């Protein structure tokens, strides 16, 4: 098979730059009993398929998966992958777990939202929220940083241990028809 890392216009990306992973397999790819999802995951020419993973090749040719395309936040026309923000937040000594996703913003379409589970003994407060936002601003480009952070006693996880963002994100999109305002 073949693997390609492409931008939204199906152009190849240079080494080190993240993009959507597209593949060409020896046999046609399809989702079981879901022709619509199969069609959505196939390139216009019918040659390539994606399952929505985002990644890049390093200088040695190793593939790194960095996020899922469905988690991408589009804020003011900028594509933001939340994994980088999540990875940073969980390094803060007051953070036990973190989820980052897009929420509605009238001017930007979406804005970056953080939801954090604090370490035992740390109480949620406006001061802790400000500290975490400032921490992100020190280490990441401004557009990748949460504009606000909410606190949860525990973040939802699947039985496999994987973070389950959908119920968190759905709270903010409950009255919206689309993830793009």
Residue ranges and their predicted role:
Residues 9-12, 22-25, 29-30, 39-40, ...:
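AMP-binding/adenylate-forming catalytic core of the ANL superfamily
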Residues 2, 31-33:
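Adenylate-forming
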Residues 138-162, 181:
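AMP-binding/adenylate-forming catalytic domain of the ANL superfamily
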Residues 4-5, 56, 156:
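Hydrophobic beta-strand positions
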Residues 3, 98, 149-151:
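Generic structural signal for residues in well-ordered beta-strands
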Residues 170-181:
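Acidic/polar alpha-helix N-cap and adjacent early helical turns
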């Amino acid at each position: 098979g073949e693997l390609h890392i492409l931008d939204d216009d199906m152009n190849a990306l240079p080494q080190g730059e993240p993009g959507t992973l597209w593949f060409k397999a020896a046999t046609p790819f399809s989702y079981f009993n879901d022709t619509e999802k199969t069609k959505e995951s196939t390139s216009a020419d019918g040659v390539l398929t994606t399952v929505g993973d985002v990644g890049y090749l390093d200088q040695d040719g190793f593939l790194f998966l960095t996020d899922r395309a469905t988690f991408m936040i589009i804020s003011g026309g900028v594509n933001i992958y939340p994994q980088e923000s999540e990875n940073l937040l969980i390094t803060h000594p007051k953070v036990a777990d973190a989820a980052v996703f897009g929420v509605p913003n009238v001017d930007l379409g979406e804005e970056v939202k953080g939801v954090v589970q604090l370490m035992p003994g740390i109480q949620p407060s406006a001061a802790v929220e400000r500290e975490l936002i400032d921490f992100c601003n020190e280490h990441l480009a401004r557009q990748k940083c949460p504009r606000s952070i909410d606190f949860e006693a525990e973040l939802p996880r699947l039985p496999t241990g994987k973070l389950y963002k959908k119920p968190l994100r759905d709270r903010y999109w409950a009255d919206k028809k689309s993830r793009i305002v």
